[in-house]
């Protein structure tokens, strides 16, 4: 366990040290990461998150690992602002999401990319149209500008021959590539992945893991992956939280 910890930089969710506070108080670091401080969340009186503190660093593949029911999805959704927390703070850089206006929250959400467990693609849209969708909703770019940007990320995730196909016409692994491309098309600062290997065979899982890891390093994104897959941990985990 000791050598595994030293290799992968592992933190327990209930580990209480001064490490997180020192990083949080250092202005050199705070713009590079997500900081979770003393987080509590309960449902119907049952504590799911109990005094959680940790950090997710820029340019690293940060993995939250745990069994079903361990609270990892609640933590991820709390960071995304999908759950109202009971107590504590979540910071994106120096900005606490507990004390921001609706306008600031909207801007922050545009800096986030999300890869959902089931890919969540639009069945009636082509690969290219799925990837263009966030730009259509959130920008005033021309169709030509959106198409050009979509084709850039299509090329980056190796889908150049599938851009005019429907999701039903491509494999599960290719669908996951579409989801990743859609998540990064707006040049996000933060990338969140919920069980990105769900339903994939081991070989394809490794390919998807490596693609996410490469994109994280290439664009210096703060990437947070929610997983129970130990192969992902061994393959790409730079910081592991369990």
Question: Which residue stretches match the model-derived regions?
Answer:
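A short, proline-enriched helix->beta-strand linker immediately N-terminal to the Walker B motif
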Residues: 185-189
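Conserved ABC ATPase signature
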Residues: 166-170, 174
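Helix-to-loop junction immediately C-terminal to a conserved catalytic motif
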Residues: 80
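Helix N-cap at the start of a conserved alpha-helix in ABC-type nucleotide-binding domains
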Residues: 202-204
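Conserved ABC ATPase "signature" region
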Residues: 143-161
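Catalytic Walker B motif of ABC-type/P-loop ATPase nucleotide-binding domains
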Residues: 191-194
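H-loop/switch region of ABC-family ATPase nucleotide-binding domains
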Residues: 227-228
């Amino acid at each position: 366990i000791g050598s595994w910890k030293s290799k992968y930089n592992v933190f327990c969710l209930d580990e209480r040290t001064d490490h997180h506070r020192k990083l949080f108080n250092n202005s050199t670091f705070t713009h590079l990461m997500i900081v979770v401080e003393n987080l509590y969340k309960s449902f119907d009186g049952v504590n799911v998150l109990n005094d959680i503190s940790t950090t997710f660093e820029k340019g690293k593949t940060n993995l939250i690992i745990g069994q079903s029911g361990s609270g990892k999805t609640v933590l991820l959704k709390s960071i995304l602002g999908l759950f109202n927390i009971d107590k504590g703070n979540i910071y994106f850089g120096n900005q606490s999401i507990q004390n921001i206006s609706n306008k600031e929250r909207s801007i922050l959400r545009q800096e986030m990319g999300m890869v959902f467990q089931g890919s969540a693609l639009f069945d009636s849209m082509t690969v290219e149209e799925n990837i263009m969708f966030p730009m259509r909703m959130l920008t005033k770019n021309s169709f030509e500008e959106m198409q050009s940007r979509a084709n850039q990320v299509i090329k980056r995730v190796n889908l150049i021959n599938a851009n005019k196909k429907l999701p039903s016409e491509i494999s599960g692994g290719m669908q996951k590539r579409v989801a990743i491309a859609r998540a990064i098309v707006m040049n996000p600062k933060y990338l969140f992945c919920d069980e990105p290997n769900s339903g994939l065979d081991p070989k394809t899982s490794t390919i998807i893991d490596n693609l996410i890891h490469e994109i994280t390093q290439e664009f210096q994104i703060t990437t947070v992956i929610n997983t129970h897959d130990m192969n992902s941990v061994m393959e790409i985990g730079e910081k592991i939280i369990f």
